[in-house]
Amino acid sequence: MSEPRADGAKIEIHLHHEGAAPPEFIRRLASEKKVDLSKIFDNTGGYVFTSFTEFLRTYEAACTVLQTPQDFYHLTRAILEECVSHGVIYTETFLAPDFCGNSDVAAWRDYLAAIEEAANHAHQEHGIVMRGIATCVRHMGPEQAKKSGLCAAETAGDFLTGFGMGGDESIGHQGDFVYAFAMAREAGLRLTTHAGEWGGSQSVREAIHDLNVERIGHGVQCIKDPALIEEIKARQITLEVCPGSNVALGVDVAPSWAEHPIKALFDQSVRVTVSTDDPPFFHTNLTREYDMLADTFGWGAAEFCVLSENAVDAAFCDAETKKTLREKVRKSWINT
């Protein structure tokens, strides 16, 4: 086994922008805007929920105080400073047009410009690189998703490089959202979607066959389906695995860290990566994720380098950025 070490350069490709909002940031905005959000916090000031459905309600309630592009500028600065503190050199965050101007293209442009400005400032100050992935919200339905897809297509470029879908996986089917994904694909955006977190292996198959994505958010349910694992490998699809989130929410294939399927997938040469999903909701960060992998599975620099290089390979960014990231990853983990 490699010696445990979690202080190298990290790459994160599954991070919900609003879901990364520190609770103190949301509480302050709520106070300033005179919005009562007391029910979504516990007596320590953290987010509170007892099920995935309640988590979604808490998440969306927190978003109600994120009302202006300036709010998102400050949120982005807070998120990226937190990322930097855990050794993250590159992150992709999911940005929902539904929470940024209610999927109005003109308003979305203003929100996205503020987020990009904050990302540029963070890059200048800390060296961290950020790219955005616009996302539709599954439980808001296919028609609303089309609006998000249009927002994404109209703003595709060097900063907004991908399109995806989050939300409640139990609602509808992946194929219901083909139109939104087709718009994004035609605009040159790279594609991912949440699948196989709650919806079983069939949800992953639908994502691959109906939406033609190159990455799967979570995807851990594939552990139940050897044929699907082989298809994922053959298609070179990357899984954006979020172990701490899965354990915190009680996903059936991950009742504990020791039973999480990431090691089995890694050992079968599936392209897995590690991210935090909605870190303050699940009391995690990328340092903790790596530390838990080290403590649970004995992973160290060699394994973490593979995880990080998998993320670089799957990142929705240009070749030159990937080259720089790969050099930093290898230097920090294996000193070559």
PLM region descriptions:
Residues 194:
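Short HxH-centered metal-ligating active-site micro-motif
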Residues 1-189, 198-203, 210-215, 221-238, ...:
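Metal-cofactor-binding active-site regions of metalloenzymes
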